[in-house]
Amino acid sequence: SAYTLNHLPVFKKMDEYNLSLIEQPLGYDDIFDHAKLQREIKTDLCLDESIHSLGDTRAAIEMGSCRIINIKPGRVGGYTESKKIHDYCASKNIPVWHGGMLESGIGRAGNVALASLPNFILPSDLSPNRKYYTEDIVETLFELNPDGTITVPTGPGIGVEVNMKALEKYTVKKCEQKA
């Protein structure tokens, strides 16, 4: 979000480098100017911080503000909304990629499953949990495969087993709810 439309000559120069995309170059709340910019350059724009819901996604695509969408489940309200955005983008031939937000292994399990959907055709912002956590709250270690992928967990539920000792160790507050 560091640029404005006054930087159009810079963006046109960037076109010469055949970049895969330029992510969120303008203000997060300005899909109108993103649409103007996208019409002027060859490089695909990817909206990230502008996307908080399916409604934002629809508006951005209909206005021509981008050709790629970054989906971050934590930003859009969870996996149900993420799946709706994925499906809508697929119906409009707009590729998506997954952005992570430093989730624990529980969130990472959901993110890896989400990123395995068919319209996530760009490399996703997912990494091994050891990159950020010396000890995670799941037993499963997410590792990069030699081809750069991460295997989708296949266990029951979200596919991973919670490390109850680690969860207890890192819990800062408990609340009991009576039926």
Could you tell me what each predicted segment is?
Residues 12, 21, 29-46, 51-149:
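Shared catalytic-loop signature of beta/alpha-barrel
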Residues 137-179:
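C-terminal extensions of enzymes
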Residues 7-10:
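Metal-coordinating catalytic core of metallo-dependent amide/deamination hydrolases
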